[in-house]
Amino acid sequence: MISDQTHMRRCLTLAKTAIGKTAPNPLVGSVIVQGDEIVGQGFHPQAGQPHGEIFALWEAGDRAKGATLYVNLEPCNHQGRTPPCTEAIIQAGIAKVVVGMVDPNPLVAGKGISRLRQAGIEVKVGVEEEACQRLNEAFCFRIKHQRPFGIFKYAMTLDGKIATAQAHSSWVTSSSARHWVHQLRSQCQAVIIGGNTVRRDNPLLTNHGVGEVNPLRVVLSRSLDLPIEAQLWDQDVAKTLVITEKTCDRNTLSHLEKLEVETLVLEQLTPLAVMEELYQRNCLQVLWECGGILAAEAIAMGTVQKVHAFLAPKIIGGVAAPTPVGELGFQQMTQALNLTDLHCQAIGPDWLFTGYLCGNDDNGQSNI
């Protein structure tokens, strides 16, 4: 007999089909099993579309009666942009529901499970729970903290440099690593850089055709000391948002507006204020691809929860060559920020280290 764990892993595989497309909604996959046979399966494709359970029920049809439904996230029990999934499950005659994890959304949070049990449906909760939570880590964080999940990505040489002393950085890593980054961008709703990166690198910041939708390209600059011409100002390729302060260069602001680049003027430009703005724009997870100065600000404010660090087998030297993270004010090694749940993998000739910033992953606050 096929185990509950196997069917739940199938739900996770289905859910991953829509990575980068569901924001601000979670990733949800569902499987309906009659005996040992899968009679229906589906996933939530994007916000506003039916949830994964509904697609699975549609495919199962009459064979859903008396069957077991598997879903990685608790079925909703409220009327949103789509009807409650619990009522559809009840009406279909499902006998048992196996849930990967409870939905952290206060609108759901156990209410879906209670409704199903009230209707006489057997409910099992917590199958492959850790994997289910990891898949929707950005959704869970956003619900809990009312801001997007922050990811900091950088690439450096063996001696810890992200560019030469002359600011040349093309390329620190291999084409394989860069393709991986393009995939990561396709899973994020926004990519953030600072003015220095625009001036030095003139980046494009798209997913280079890896995904269907490019992330919003966000430039942070208090002064608006930005080049008149840049790839980011081409709005036919992807949309760009420039965020600045009231003391900015008004000529540059006017120039950007003429180019139809969206601008936003804040009283005070901080990483936290930016993340709050992106939360209002329905972002689930945001990628920080900035230089060291802005990265240090983002980390210090608790707006980075996860780190992807590429290590390239190169040495370039240079006392003045920039490093990934600027000044954090630490004086002793005991103050260092530790990464948890560390994972490393080889991508081409480079190594990728992935982990979570201790103190920034659970409570959303920096421990600096």
From Swiss-Prot:
Please give the Gene Ontology molecular function terms for this protein.
5-amino-6-(5-phosphoribosylamino)uracil reductase activity; diaminohydroxyphosphoribosylaminopyrimidine deaminase activity; NADP binding; zinc ion binding
Cofactor: how bound: Binds 1 zinc ion.
Q: Mind telling me what this protein is named?
A: Riboflavin biosynthesis protein RibD
Alphabetical keyword list:
Hydrolase, Metal-binding, Multifunctional enzyme, NADP, Oxidoreductase, Riboflavin biosynthesis, Zinc
E.C. code: 3.5.4.26, 1.1.1.193
Q: Where is this region: Deaminase?
A: 1-146
Active-site residues are: 53 (proton donor)
Give the matching InterPro entries. Answer: APOBEC/CMP_deaminase_Zn-bd, CMP_dCMP_dom, Cytidine_deaminase-like, DHFR-like_dom_sf, Eubact_RibD, RibD_C, RibDG_C, Riboflavin_Biosynth_HTPR
Reactions it catalyzes: 2,5-diamino-6-hydroxy-4-(5-phosphoribosylamino)-pyrimidine + H2O + H(+) = 5-amino-6-(5-phospho-D-ribosylamino)uracil + NH4(+); 5-amino-6-(5-phospho-D-ribitylamino)uracil + NADP(+) = 5-amino-6-(5-phospho-D-ribosylamino)uracil + NADPH + H(+)
Tell me which residues bind substrate: 169, 185, 205, 289
Native organism is: Synechocystis sp. (strain ATCC 27184 / PCC 6803 / Kazusa)
